[in-house]
């Protein structure tokens, strides 16, 4: 069993602070338009070059167990902010470092951390309310492009994301994929798509593109395995009489059933394409139901009391066109009623709010977007693998930041909103250690702007004082060296990003300040023996595998 060591009081807090500083100092050099990059070593493959706070934070683990605890705490700030808002991780880390540094000074001087915490909470509430007041809704295409361009530090990416959002709507799915070419492009897939293609290549209608295109088809949706043609014969005969093609979605189509469909297709008697149902288990049932609602059909499921032999034409779904590729099916313009689709979307949104699982949230988001129509794919290209990874990462970040901006609006960027929020903090009436907690947050609000200026090679404190004296919204443009209106200059941040950064930083800082003991594991005696020079002698023959 591993032994534990405990550190108390000031010694414990200082060890945590050293860990916080190590991580924050590595992350904060990336802040602002003139921020630097950080190179991350990889055991396999090429190193990663990035200026993304959360990517750097995730990669840092410290040797000293006490310092590592502080490092992990502030890493949590970056990860939580990234999960909620998709950006602002460097700002959050920097704010946490500033609050912890200032707070520990006061605790060492005799302030009561529990009362200070109350002051911190009050100040954060005032800042959050001020951010809401200052935020402006994002409505125009240009604002969306601006937010994305700032996050990715590339106007071309900004335009690409704005195009994607314009085409698939704000709830639409936008995915980022690696491309084989050097350039970055946008491809929009209209309608609902799922990652299952034709079961047999004999079903294709366009040999050049290797795809099957069905115009105005019927859609039979089933959750069972179909191996006998007798099961589906009654409904097939009804469809043949209409002269229309058909898409058959089932768990599996095999044996006699598949052979019969292929022979009829080759003879030109009947055009039917079979595809496997998407997803698995409960998610498959939900997705089949989504397809049914989108196409105004019903799922032929014995669980729902619908037997295959009893399926009539009015139970089949319809769409204007269906394109079936090797591993993808796209349903364009399904015949489902708008009201039914809206109700289904509302139901998925409710599930989204309730779920705790990140994976479930991602899958529900995908389903929601597929229902609301349209999937945009940004194909990222670059000359080298290292550049490709870095570029893809920037686009994913920009996409998350843009979605956050659409949700809660935008505020002035460049650390200006936090400086402007200081006035709101000053209005709070308090005294004693509570006031100390409030002042600690007030001082931390200056830190992002100071760091942006420092990274640009300018004296940060001078810039902070000038911006404090200027009107609301006026800040320092680190790229041009000019003091101007941030929003007019296109320097903007999503309000959600700024809000999350402040809340998460304050939460972790309050925890560090109120820590009185830190417990860490020490290597056990057996482990220590094993680590001796002779302990691993018998494994010398494996040297070649390293």
From Swiss-Prot:
Forms a cylinder of 14 subunits composed of two heptameric rings stacked back-to-back. Interacts with the co-chaperonin GroES. Keywords: ATP-binding, Chaperone, Cytoplasm, Isomerase, Nucleotide-binding. ATP binds at residues 30-33, 87-91, 414, 477-479, 493. One of its GO terms (cellular component) is cytoplasm. InterPro entries: Chaperonin_Cpn60_CS, Cpn60/GroEL, Cpn60/GroEL/TCP-1, GroEL-like_apical_dom_sf, GROEL-like_equatorial_sf, TCP-1-like_intermed_sf. Together with its co-chaperonin GroES, plays an essential role in assisting protein folding. The GroEL-GroES system forms a nano-cage that allows encapsulation of the non-native substrate proteins and provides a physical environment optimized to promote and accelerate protein folding. The lineage of its organism: Bacteria, Bacillati, Bacillota, Clostridia, Eubacteriales. Its main location: cytoplasm. Its EC number is 5.6.1.7. It catalyses: ATP + H2O + a folded polypeptide = ADP + phosphate + an unfolded polypeptide. Belongs to the chaperonin (HSP60) family. GO terms for molecular function: ATP binding; ATP-dependent protein folding chaperone; isomerase activity; unfolded protein binding. This is Chaperonin GroEL. It is an enzyme of class 5 (isomerase). It is found in: Cytoplasm. NCBIfam families: GroEL (TIGR02348), PRK00013.1 (NF000592), PRK12849.1 (NF009487), PRK12850.1 (NF009488), PRK12851.1 (NF009489). Pfam families: Cpn60_TCP1 (PF00118). Transmembrane segments: none annotated. It comes from the Bacteria. One of its GO terms (biological process) is protein refolding.
């Amino acid at each position: 069993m591993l032994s534990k060591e405990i550190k108390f009081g000031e010694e414990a807090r200082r060890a945590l602070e050293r860990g916080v500083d190590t991580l924050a100092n590595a992350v904060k050099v990336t802040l602002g338009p003139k921020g630097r990059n950080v190179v991350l070593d990889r055991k396999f493959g090429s190193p990663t070059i990035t200026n993304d706070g959360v990517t750097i934070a995730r990669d840092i683990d410290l040797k000293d167990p006490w310092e590592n605890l502080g490092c992990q705490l502030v890493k949590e700030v970056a990860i939580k902010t990234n999960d909620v808002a998709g950006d602002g991780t460097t700002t959050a880390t920097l704010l946490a470092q500033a609050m912890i540094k200032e707070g520990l000074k006061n605790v060492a001087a005799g302030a009561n951390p529990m009362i200070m915490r109350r002051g911190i909470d009050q100040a954060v509430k005032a800042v959050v309310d001020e951010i809401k007041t200052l935020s402006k809704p994002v409505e125009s295409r240009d604002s969306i492009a601006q937010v994305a361009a700032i996050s990715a530090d590339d106007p071309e990416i900004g335009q690409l994301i704005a195009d994607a959002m314009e085409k698939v709507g704000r709830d639409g799915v936008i995915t980022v994929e690696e491309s084989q070419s050097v350039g970055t492009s946008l491809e929009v897939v209209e309608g609902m798509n799922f990652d299952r293609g034709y079961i047999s290549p004999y079903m294709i209608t366009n040999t050049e593109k290797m795809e099957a295109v069905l115009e105005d088809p019927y859609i039979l949706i089933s959750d069972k395995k179909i191996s006998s043609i007798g099961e589906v014969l009654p409904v097939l005969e009804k469809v043949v009489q209409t002269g229309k093609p058909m898409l058959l979605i089932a768990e599996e189509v095999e044996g006699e059933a598949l052979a019969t469909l292929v022979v009829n297709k080759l003879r030109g008697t009947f055009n039917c394409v079979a595809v496997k149902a998407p997803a698995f288990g409960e998610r498959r049932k939900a997705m089949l139901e989504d397809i049914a609602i989108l196409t105004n059909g019903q799922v032929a499921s014995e669980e729902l009391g619908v037997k295959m032999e009893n399926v009539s034409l009015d139970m089949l779904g319809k769409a204007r066109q269906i394109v079936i590729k090797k591993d993808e099916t796209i349903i364009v313009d399904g015949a489902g009623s708008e009201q039914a689709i809206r109700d289904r979307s509302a139901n998925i949104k409710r599930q989204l709010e309730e779920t705790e699982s990140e994976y479930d949230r991602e899958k529900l988001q995908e389903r929601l977007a597929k229902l609301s129509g349209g999937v945009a794919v940004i194909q990222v290209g670059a000359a080298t693998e290292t550049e490709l990874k870095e570029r893809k990462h920037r686009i994913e970040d920009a996409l998350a930041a843009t979605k956050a901006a659409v949700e809660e609006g935008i505020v002035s960027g460049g650390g200006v909103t936090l400086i402007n929020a200081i006035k709101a903090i000053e209005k709070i009436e308090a005294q004693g250690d509570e006031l100390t907690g409030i002042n600690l947050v007030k001082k931390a609000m200056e830190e992002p702007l100071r760091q942006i200026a420092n990274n640009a090679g300018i004296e940060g404190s001078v810039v902070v004082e000038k911006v404090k004296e200027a009107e609301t919204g006026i800040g320092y443009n680190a790229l041009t060296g000019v003091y101007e209106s941030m929003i007019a200059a296109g320097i903007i941040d999503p309000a959600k990003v700024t809000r999350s950064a402040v809340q998460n930083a304050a939460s972790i800082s309050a925890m560090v300040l109120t820590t009185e003991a830190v417990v860490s594991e020490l290597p056990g005696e057996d482990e220590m023996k094993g680590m001796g020079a002779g302990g691993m002698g018998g494994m010398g023959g494996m040297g070649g595998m390293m």
